[in-house]
């Protein structure tokens, strides 16, 4: 498709399937005008417009079928090309490829293989597409929907999954509902954009479960605004903010650096240390009017003015007002952890609150109630969204989390009856699950995916049953797994077309002729009464009913198939296409702080990582962890150490285009010299856990700049994750 160099975007209008009649529905993608000095206005997701009847070819021979396009696209990725790009010898790559694909040797469908990844994949300017590549491989191998299969993330925090589920990112509402944009002028228009129509090939059917989006959205609005959300006032749709630009992490800090964002709440987030280009973040905080920090320890963000290198004169010029609130630690509060398998596990507080510490919900509630009071007294441009927020908790100043969890689960606002089973739920009762949600205002639910987690039977998240009859690690009575306590998503794919498990000794779900329904050791991820002869596609959340080797509708900013691009800073040009070495839709931030180096000046690759003995920036306040690894180091490959005469324990100075970092050398054989596209290349590694605040730094006596003083502020164009895993530096003895 056409690439617009000015806007750094593709024309995505043809990123779609062909219709059975040969037509292709063009995608309509409306642009949002740029606001202020913001570098990247966001566009609303394109309308979900797949052809009603899709063209298909079971022979996989049509030159435009997805399979043939996929083969053509990846025909350039020969084992020799893989070696040129990655430095992995051809023989090692082939050995790994043969091992993983051997599970399907001779057509054997019994085995399953998983791909497990962490931020080593995500923290690149093509990170989302790297994970997409893994998904394509797993789809081709039949490893999706299988116990022991899938693409599984190892999280860097114990509740990343829960934070995302509950809209911890700017472009979604709870339950992964896309936020409204200024082009959504009514609830109806918003739902039309979000709700996909089924795209059914003549050969199979589609459940298209996202067609229930209006039920999820109306129930969410009732949870948020209660009686103020009615059909007559468009379900309070106009109370919702209309997101007109990118508000992801890097953009917020960039806007603070530009003077657009005047203040920030930093809760559970050491922004100076965790973000790219620590110095830019420090300079951004210098320009802020106020900073509110909610932490259990002082950190680099709450005391940003103590950064090494800030002079007394500079400190006098800083006018930022800092409020540090006394928060509770994880062991001092109850709530839930949600792991990567989507298990909602309830925990109880193990310790009393120390001193003046407050629970998170009390801090947030008191801030909200004070803001509401100010709007009541003083008015404002648009107070309705604040004044009408539903806040009917027993203790408004400090809501019990169990009460909040019940609200998230959902309840009936009127008497309900299932038309098929005649089961009834009385008004005020907890909902058994999301299948009961309505779009007429008779149900309330804070997150449709969590419905079923706190029912009339009690707190399902607190269950601790260890029985596992299947032996597959399903443990159906341990906690609650969204959605519907289902442990393996798309588990219909664990059976053949006739509904028989691929592996009869490891049965997940199956079609029961006796009951004429799907049954199993897991909750079937399928329409319960859809017979195998109905040929319903197993991927019920996609309107086409099948897994996506090709991503239609412009859902990915950089292409329907993944493509390799070099990091923004790389020692080589991209062997696949040197004329476009880096991801073309990645937008660099445009301030004087945003500097990028070249291999001419910076000849070493640097990556950052975490250690087993430390947890981000918090355990450096724990004496036991500090005893295990008391100080940072720079991991240097033995070959580079020999070349430069570096000995273990010598202090090194590492410099990037953005900053300088010093620590002792640790010479290892873990990191190897690489030959990338014929060029001898070296890489160093720096753990991220240290800075200038904590007992590990001897309360400032051994303070240093954070490791991320070196990394660039540049992000993946889909998930907006910074590129921490590959940038250029030079290494010298200090």
Where are these regions (language model features)?
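Extended redox/cofactor-interaction regions of prokaryotic respiratory oxidoreductases
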Residues: 38-54, 61, 66-69, 73, ...
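Short acidic (Asp/Glu) and glycine-rich catalytic loops that position anionic groups and cofactors
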Residues: 48-50, 72-78, 109-117, 230-232, ...
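Conserved short loop/turn motifs at secondary-structure junctions
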Residues: 81-89, 117-125, 154-158, 268-273
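Flexible, glycine/charged-enriched surface loops at secondary-structure junctions
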Residues: 108-114, 145-154, 377-386
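Glycine/threonine-rich phosphate-binding loop and adjacent beta-strand/alpha-helix elements that clamp
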Residues: 320-323, 330-352, 550, 688
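Long, C-terminal catalytic modules of enzymes
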Residues: 335, 342-443, 447-449, 454, ...
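Long, contiguous, secondary-structure-rich segments that constitute the structural scaffold
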Residues: 362-418, 519-531, 539-545, 550-574, ...
């Amino acid at each position: 498709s056409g690439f617009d160099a000015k806007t750094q975007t593709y024309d995505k209008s043809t990123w779609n399937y062909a219709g059975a009649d040969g037509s292709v529905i063009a995608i309509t993608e409306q642009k949002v005008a740029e606001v202020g000095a913001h570098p990247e206005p966001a566009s609303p997701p394109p309308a979900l417009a797949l052809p009603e009847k899709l063209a298909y070819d079971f022979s996989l021979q049509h030159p435009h079928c997805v399979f043939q396009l996929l083969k053509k696209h990846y025909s350039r990725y020969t084992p020799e090309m893989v070696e040129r790009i990655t430095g992995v010898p051809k023989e090692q790559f082939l050995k790994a490829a043969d091992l993983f694909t051997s599970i399907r040797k001779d057509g054997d469908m019994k085995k399953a293989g998983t791909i497990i990844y962490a931020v080593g994949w995500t923290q690149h300017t093509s990170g989302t597409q790297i994970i997409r590549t893994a998904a394509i491989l797993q789809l081709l191998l039949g490893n999706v929907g299988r116990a022991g299969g899938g693409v599984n993330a190892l999280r860097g925090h114990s509740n990343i999954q829960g934070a995302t589920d509950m809209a911890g990112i700017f472009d979604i509402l709870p339950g992964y509902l896309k936020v409204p944009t200024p082009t959504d002028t009514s609830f109806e228009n918003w739902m039309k954009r979000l709700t996909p129509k089924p795209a059914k090939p003549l050969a199979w059917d589609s459940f298209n479960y996202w067609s229930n989006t209006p039920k999820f959205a109306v129930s969410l609005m009732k949870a948020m605004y209660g009686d103020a959300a009615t059909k007559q006032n468009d379900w309070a749709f106009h109370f919702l903010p209309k997101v007109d630009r990118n508000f992801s992490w890097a953009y917020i800090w960039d806007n603070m650096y530009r003077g657009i964002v005047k203040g920030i709440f930093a809760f559970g987030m050491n922004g100076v240390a965790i973000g790219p280009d620590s110095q830019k973040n420090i300079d951004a905080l210098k320009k802020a009017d106020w900073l509110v920090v909610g932490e259990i320890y002082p950190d680099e963000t709450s005391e940003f003015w103590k950064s090494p290198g800030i002079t007394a004169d500079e400190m006098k010029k800083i006018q930022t007002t800092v409020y540090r609130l006394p928060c509770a630690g994880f062991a001092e509060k109850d709530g839930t952890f949600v792991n990567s398998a989507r298990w909602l596990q309830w925990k109880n507080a193990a310790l009393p609150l120390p001193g003046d510490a407050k629970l998170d919900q009390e801090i947030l509630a008191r801030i909200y109630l004070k803001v509401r009071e100010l709007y009541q007294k003083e008015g404002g441009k648009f107070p309705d969204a604040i004044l009408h927020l539903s806040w009917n908790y027993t203790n408004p100043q400090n809501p019990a989390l169990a009460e909040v969890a019940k609200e998230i689960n959902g309840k009936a606002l009127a008497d309900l009856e299932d038309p098929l089973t005649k089961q009834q739920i009385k008004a005020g009762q907890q909902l058994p699950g999301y299948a009961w949600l309505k779009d007429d205002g008779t149900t309330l639910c804070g997150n449709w995916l969590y419905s079923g987690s706190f029912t009339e039977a009690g707190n399902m998240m607190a269950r601790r049953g260890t029985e596992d009859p299947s032996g597959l690690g399903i443990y159906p009575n341990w906690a609650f797994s969204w959605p519907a306590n289902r442990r393996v998503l798309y588990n219909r794919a664990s059976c053949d077309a006739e509904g028989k498990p691929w592996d009869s000794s490891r049965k997940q779900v199956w079609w029961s002729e006796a009951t004429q329904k799907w049954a199993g050791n897991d909750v079937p991820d399928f329409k319960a009464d859809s017979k195998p002869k109905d040929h319903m596609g197993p991927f019920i959340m996609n309107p086409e009913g099948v897994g996506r080797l090709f991503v239609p509708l412009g859902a990915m900013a950089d292409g329907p198939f993944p493509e390799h691009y070099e990091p923004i800073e790389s020692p080589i040009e991209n062997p696949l296409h040197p004329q476009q070495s880096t991801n073309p839709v990645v937008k660099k931030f445009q301030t004087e702080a945003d500097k990028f180096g070249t291999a001419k000046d910076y000849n070493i690759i640097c990556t950052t990582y975490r250690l087993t003995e430390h947890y981000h920036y918090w355990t450096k306040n724990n004496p036991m962890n500090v005893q295990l690894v008391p100080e940072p180091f720079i991991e240097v490959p033995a070959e580079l150490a020999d070349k430069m005469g570096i000995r273990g324990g010598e202090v090194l100075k590492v410099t990037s285009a953005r900053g300088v970092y010093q620590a002792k050398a640790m010479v290892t054989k873990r990191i190897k010299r690489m030959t990338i596209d014929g060029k001898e290349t070296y890489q160093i590694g720096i753990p991220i856990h240290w800075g200038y605040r904590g007992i590990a730094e001897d309360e400032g006596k051994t303070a240093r700049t954070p490791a991320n003083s070196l990394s660039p502020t540049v992000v993946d164009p889909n998930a907006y994750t910074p590129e921490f895993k590959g940038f250029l530096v030079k290494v010298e003895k200090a």
